[in-house]
From Swiss-Prot:
Keyword terms of this UniProt record: cAMP, Hydrolase, Periplasm, Signal
Lineage: Bacteria, Pseudomonadati, Pseudomonadota, Gammaproteobacteria, Enterobacterales
PROSITE patterns, alphabetized: PDEASE_II
Protein name, per record: Probable 3',5'-cyclic-nucleotide phosphodiesterase
Organism from which the protein derives: Yersinia pestis
Alphabetical GO biological process terms: cAMP catabolic process; negative regulation of glucose mediated signaling pathway
Localization in the cell: Periplasm
Amino acid sequence: MKYLSIKSASDKIKSGLLKTGVILSFSLFSSLSTAAFEVVALGVDGGVSDGNLTSYLIRNDSQPLYLGLDAGSVLPGIARALEKGHFAAITDAMAAPLTRQGYIFRQSINSYFISHAHLDHVSGLIIGSPDDSKKTIYASADTIDVLRNYYFNWRVWPNFTDSGSGARLGTYRMQVVRPAQSLSLGLTRLTGEMYPLSHDKSPSSMLLISSNNEFFAYFGDTGPDDVEKSKNLDTVWRKLAEKVTQQQLKGMIIEVSYPNDVADNKLFGHMTPTWLLKELKKLEQYSGEGQPLKGLPVVISHIKPSFQQGQDVRKLILSELQQGNDMGIEFILMEQGDSQKFQ
């Protein structure tokens, strides 16, 4: 399958109408197109920078409510997105008596999916919990166990959940998700299926999000199958290949934490560009002949900042990905506060 931009598709349709002499308002075709996934990057780094840790929002852009995808840095990301002019539909009058940032945090984010319980994926959730509104937290049994017993336990932090030790303040309803279980995600009009990932000594997970029979894949931290001695990614690629062949996969977010000069025994459950390209080759293989992934948007997340003088690690990783990219994939680096549509 070739992933065709909306503009390219529009131009081809217009050209065809002119050639056949059919006169028809193009707005009709626009109205027939399906809604897009909107993704807002609240945090994109893989550690160190505590104000810019992994967290994204996603919604069907015809719906007002977002699903949070991890929650490393939430409020700083909302503030940055507002500075960049996003969330324009949420005005001061609409948000009152809250600030726009507060309204988005409390009202627009309807629920969260947490891929795993490492601090760089949950610290924003924990810190923000005293001022949050009631929400459902979707996660694996292991992740729920860590959140309940090691964070929200009245020793590290008050228990803002509906289970666990001590008084239960009940802000967050903890919902265990079983592998491959299909479930509705709060009031977002999104549905999802979770698949296990291998992240060194910690289990992680991928969420396959769907809306109107279109799909978007969000990966928590993961190492390559060969290094992790796992088949988890292979299972995921076979699942995603079904969506590629049906032209239903609109994009994905996946990690590359380190550049290629990091040895396999120093990855600790993460990816390099070479390893991600090898893994995506499996998806290509399972998806059919030709270049089935051509034009597929792949957002690279969780890049770990470097303290080395003169090294732009984000630029380096993108360059290494592009050098080995013979699949026609569109690799994307989102910055904190960016918003992008996938359709």
